[in-house]
Amino acid sequence: MEFHLVPAGEIETEPLDVGPDSKLNLVDVIDRAQGAPFCAGICEVFPGAPVDFDYDDDAAVCYMLEGELTLAEDGETRALRPGDVVYVPRRKGLLVYWSTDSYGKFFYVTYPHWR
């Protein structure tokens, strides 16, 4: 078969080192290993210092699954809730801060691969 299925029971996020005061877990579910030109996965953000991601080399689309997240960029913030979709364009110097007061979980697709 040409498609690649990852059963829900096989998807487990793992901690990503994002600094001592931040906590973020994620897993790339589909990426180069499956021959994809993009990276797709699940990310969980926990309370703590905001997590910053640069978008110098990739763009992202994220679909909120659970909880709430706040995205901040250049002093502006946006709240994300379940069902919301956000597009973050690829742009040199673009830095987006992700944070939550409780918990937030989302599905992401980056193009090209973010790692």
Locations of regions flagged by a protein language model:
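Short hydrophobic/aromatic-rich beta-strand segments that constitute the beta-sheet cores
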Residues: D52, L71, F106-Y108
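Ligand-binding loop in jelly-roll beta-barrel domains
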Residues: R90-R115
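A short, N-terminal "cap"/entry segment at the start of jelly-roll beta-barrel domains
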Residues: M1-C39
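Short acidic-glycine-tyrosine-enriched beta hairpin
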Residues: G75-R91
